[in-house]
Amino acid sequence: MSNIESIVEKLSSLTLLQAAELSKRLEEEWGVSAAAPVAVVASAAGESAAAVAEKTEFEVFLEGFDAKKKISVIKEVRAITELGLKEAKDFVESAPKSLKTGVSKDEAEELKKKLEAAGATIILR
């Protein structure tokens, strides 16, 4: 019996719990993820795969900010959210936090650009 066949035989005899443990250990050992890649299939109507997979709503997430530019970030958050000065300050200081949800891609990118120019660290989700 070859090495490959004996490995297949041993793996086939594992219980579900043992297989899950093996998967975790291999992920840690090799630094990879066992998550399956997501494949997008074009529909019969002829839609392109890019159009099907494109996200339409985004969340602007305040990850943090440059301490030297805190005042600029507070001003920008205040302008975007229409919060009062104290509320905007508290919001910025409580980062990481979601700033705005359900916005279009263009609006999210514009907000990100403004906030990063002010000194914030922004993630679009």
UniProtKB/Swiss-Prot annotation:
Q: Which GO terms describe its cellular component?
A: cytoplasm; ribonucleoprotein complex; ribosome
Write down the HAMAP family for this protein, in alphabetical order. Answer: Ribosomal_bL12
InterPro entries linked: Ribosomal_bL12 (IPR000206), Ribosomal_bL12_C (IPR013823), Ribosomal_bL12_C/ClpS-like (IPR014719), Ribosomal_bL12_oligo (IPR008932), Ribosomal_bL12_oligo_N_sf (IPR036235)
Q: Which residues does UniProt assign to the signal peptide?
A: none
Alphabetical UniProt keywords: Ribonucleoprotein, Ribosomal protein
Q: What is this protein called?
A: Large ribosomal subunit protein bL12
Q: How the protein assembles, per its UniProt entry? A: Homodimer. Part of the ribosomal stalk of the 50S ribosomal subunit. Forms a multimeric L10(L12)X complex, where L10 forms an elongated spine to which 2 to 4 L12 dimers bind in a sequential fashion. Binds GTP-bound translation factors.
Give TM regions.
none
Judging by the UniProt lineage, the source's domain of life is Bacteria
Q: Function, please?
A: Forms part of the ribosomal stalk which helps the ribosome interact with GTP-bound translation factors. Is thus essential for accurate translation.
| Family statement | Belongs to the bacterial ribosomal protein bL12 family.
**What terms describe the molecular function in GO for this protein?**
mRNA binding; structural constituent of ribosome
GO process annotations (BP): translation
